[in-house]
Every structure is written in C-alpha cells, then in structure tokens.
C-alpha cells in the first residue's frame, strides 16, 4: 500500500507531466473564469430593503455621533445600490412617451416613470404614478434632503454643465431638462447620464453626459 507521501509525490509528478509548456496568460485565465452571476432585480430590491431596515434600527438606538455615522453609511449604501444594482438592470429597456412598465427589460418606460420607478424600488416613499407624471423640479424638491438645495443652471454648454456637476462630488443626482428627466452618476470625475432616452435608439442608456443627444437638445433647468 502506498504511503501518503508517495501518493502526494505521484500526484505532483502527474500534474507536472500534464502541465502546459508555458503558464496561462491573464487573458486566458479571464476567458476560463466563469462569468459572475448577477443578482436578479427583485433580489437587489429585497437586499436593499433589508439593509435599510437594519440601518433604521441602528439609527433609532444610536446616539448623535452614531446617528451621523449611520446616515453616512446609509447614503453610501443607497448610492451604491442605485448605481451598481438597480440601474444596470434597466439598460436596453425600450422608451415610449407613455411607457409605464414596472419591470426592467419588459414593456416600455417613459423618462419620468423610469426615475419614479427606480426611486420607489430604492425605498423612497413616493407615489410612482404622480411622480412619473410630475415636473422634474417637483421630483428634485421632494427628494432633496433638508438643508440641501436644488442646483439650477441656465444657458450652459454640456461640457461646462458636466464640470459643474462633477464639482458637486461623487454620487447620483436627478437632473431635470425642459422636456426630459434622468439620473446623473458621478464617479471619480466621470459624469454619466442614465436615462430612458427619447433620442437615437430610444432605450434606457448609460452614456457620457457631455455627449448625450438629450442634453444637447435640452436646456437644463436644474
């Protein structure tokens, strides 16, 4: 009977014989790696709701200093869930003037309903239909935290507007145009426009803010 050391040695020798002539490249390893499984939209919504409840419990039990930390954590968790969790699921969903679908990838969605649906699914206590039909400024005012203001820009070129928004810092913002509304995502100075686009392919897109056709065609209101 072979001893354990001999078995290990035989295994090592066998592995050496079967080894390729050269180690795999990073590209080969990437191709061989299984694609990560993305959580479903429903799972993202449920996970965010669970996180929100846990944070609310900590907020209720904590003192002033702890409350500030929890609020900062909640803000970061919400931003991350919106940008990396909820919004990506909607990419490619068709736009329509009267689109009201509640599920990404099915039916059609109008720009206002896209914003209101995302906000509702993120945990905001809003009336989806009313917000979906409301003016962008009304949505902005209703979702702006106390002590914060709605930034307003008029007659400004897309590139300059992108720089002004980037100066506000990383995060996710709601932007209202004269005939349109959507989200602006800022990360490391990169400014993206995520919206149910009524131009070009007419689907939900994530595109460079300054180059977005909808920005070019619209006068920013806030």
Can you name each region flagged by the protein language model?
Residues 97-101, 168, 205-210:
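N-terminal post-signal-peptidase region of extra-cytosolic proteins
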Residues 133-205:
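...with weaker cross-activation on analogous glycine-rich loops/strands in unrelated enzymes
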Residues 14-16:
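C-terminal motif of bacterial Sec signal peptides marking the signal peptidase cleavage site
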Residues 23-137:
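N-terminal capping segments
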Residues 19:
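Short, conserved catalytic or interaction motifs in soluble domains
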Residues 208-222:
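Glycine-rich, aromatic-bearing surface loops/beta-hairpins
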Residues 3-10:
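Sec-dependent signal peptide recognition
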């Amino acid at each position: 009977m072979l001893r354990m050391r001999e078995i290990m040695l035989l295994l090592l020798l066998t592995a050496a014989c079967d080894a390729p002539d050269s180690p795999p490249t990073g590209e080969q390893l990437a191709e061989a790696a299984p694609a990560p499984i993305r959580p479903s939209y429903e799972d993202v919504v449920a996970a965010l709701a669970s996180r929100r409840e846990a944070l609310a419990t900590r907020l209720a039990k904590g003192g002033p200093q702890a409350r500030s930390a929890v609020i900062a954590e909640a803000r970061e968790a919400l931003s991350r869930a919106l940008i990396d969790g909820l919004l990506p699921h909607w990419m490619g969903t068709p736009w329509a003037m009267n689109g009201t679908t509640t599920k990404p990838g099915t039916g059609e969605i109008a720009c206002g309903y896209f914003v209101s649906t995302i906000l509702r699914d993120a945990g905001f206590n809003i009336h989806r239909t009313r917000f979906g039909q409301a003016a962008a400024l009304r949505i902005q005012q209703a979702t702006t935290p106390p002590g914060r203001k709605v930034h307003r820009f008029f007659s400004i070129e897309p590139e300059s507007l992108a720089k002004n928004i980037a100066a506000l810092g990383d995060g996710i913002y709601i932007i209202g145009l004269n005939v349109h509304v959507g989200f602006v995502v800022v990360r490391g100075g990169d400014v993206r426009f995520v919206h149910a686009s009524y131009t070009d392919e007419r689907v939900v897109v994530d595109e460079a803010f300054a180059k977005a056709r909808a920005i070019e065609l619209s006068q920013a209101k806030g």
